[in-house]
């Protein structure tokens, strides 16, 4: 029997404005289109994908806590909170679920304050700069990681 992995995709602040917000940086796809693509990819990867977006740091912390016992892993675009939130970092460390950090833009080619990630030290990996494919590759990497853990 094949395991169907349960994956939570979390989107941080301002990502609800995708498609309108700075399309030269973030692309023209809406968050709904990204979520639909990830759910579709999930079918092929034998992963059940759930998504959640919030502009509130506290709601994202609560979602991470709620993932414990309900999901096998997290794909997380913490957006601006990547660079500022110790609370999100600590929540991820507390639940100890494998997490892949993703970003639509290459945070390392942008302003220097964006080069710092508080999420990366508690994530299994980081993918950035590939637009929608950052999410898609992040989901695939997480499922590959989970499959590897199940095999060992």
From Swiss-Prot:
GO biological process: amino acid biosynthetic process; aromatic amino acid family biosynthetic process; chorismate biosynthetic process; quinate catabolic process
E.C. code: 4.2.1.10
Positions annotated as active site in the UniProt record: 26, 103
Pathway, per record: Metabolic intermediate biosynthesis; chorismate biosynthesis; chorismate from D-erythrose 4-phosphate and phosphoenolpyruvate: step 3/7
Annotated positions for site Transition state stabilizer: 21
Keywords: Amino-acid biosynthesis, Aromatic amino acid biosynthesis, Lyase
PROSITE patterns in alphabetical order: DEHYDROQUINASE_II (PS01029)
Reaction(s) the record says it catalyses: 3-dehydroquinate = 3-dehydroshikimate + H2O
GO MF, one annotated term: 3-dehydroquinate dehydratase activity
EC class: lyase
Function: Catalyzes a trans-dehydration via an enolate intermediate.
Protein name: 3-dehydroquinate dehydratase
Species this chain originates from: Synechocystis sp. (strain ATCC 27184 / PCC 6803 / Kazusa)
